[in-house]
Amino acid sequence: YLFVMTNRMKLLNYSFEGLPNLKKLDEIMRQHPAVKRVLEQEGAPHTLTD
């Protein structure tokens, strides 16, 4: 669930400044092949207003 939140932070352009552990978690998760596949399958991000 934490990766979902860091992913949302990126989509909303929130800064990871002062949150080095969250930034590292996000970077590590994005390197996993399974996570890469899921993000590819999901396609382009959408917003609540789309």
From Swiss-Prot:
InterPro entries: Glutathione-S-Trfase_C_sf. It catalyses: RX + glutathione = an S-substituted glutathione + a halide anion + H(+). Optimum temperature is 40 degrees Celsius. It is an enzyme of class 2 (transferase). The keyword Cytoplasm does not apply. GO terms for molecular function: glutathione transferase activity. This is Glutathione S-transferase. The lineage of its organism: Bacteria, Bacillati, Bacillota, Bacilli, Lactobacillales.
